[in-house]
A protein has these predicted regions:
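Pyridoxal 5′-phosphate
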Residues: 1-153
């Protein structure tokens, strides 16, 4: 914060206030409190269990798709994220076609180029699951991936 501002001179507030610009984020703090209350009411262990079930389900379904490469550890050692590639199809093409059917995933190097180099790929697809994801949405992802295979067959 500043102490005073004039056209010819500005003075700064005392420490630590001179490093805090603008209005304090009060609405954001209240929103964060509400989000914490919401998550605590559900229970973090319940959220983790749901995520694990979804990840296990997704890995099972995705592993049945011909030409599918899955990256990462088994379901019991990962969060609700699955990275994959579909043989012969660039990840951006996969993401674009899935988007047309209402399925949103990420495609690219995900800010981890050293890992992509280690895996020997330029990019991957990444699907994420959380509290609000339901198994039917994973089914929609899988159906979309079969459609991608048809386009590039």
């Amino acid at each position: 914060m500043n102490g005073s501002v004039r056209t010819d001179k500005t003075t700064w507030g005392e420490l630590p206030h001179k490093f805090e610009a603008g209005t304090a984020p009060m609405a954001e703090a209240v929103g964060l409190g509400a989000a914490i209350d919401y998550l605590e009411a559900i229970g973090l262990e319940n959220i983790a269990a749901h995520e694990h079930e979804l990840t296990e389900y997704a890995l099972g379904k995705l592993s049945e798709i011909p030409g599918m490469t899955l990256y990462g550890p088994p379901a019991d050692r990962r969060a609700g994220i699955v990275s994959f590639n579909l043989e012969g199809v660039h990840p951006h093409d996969v993401a674009q076609i899935l988007d047309l059917s209402g399925v949103a995933i990420r495609a690219g190097h995900h800010c981890c180029q050293p890992l992509m180099q280690k895996l020997g790929v330029a990019a991957t697809n990444r699907a994420s699951f959380y509290l609000y994801t339901i198994p039917e949405e994973i089914d929609q992802l899988v159906e979309g991936l079969y459609a991608v295979r048809k386009v590039f067959a």
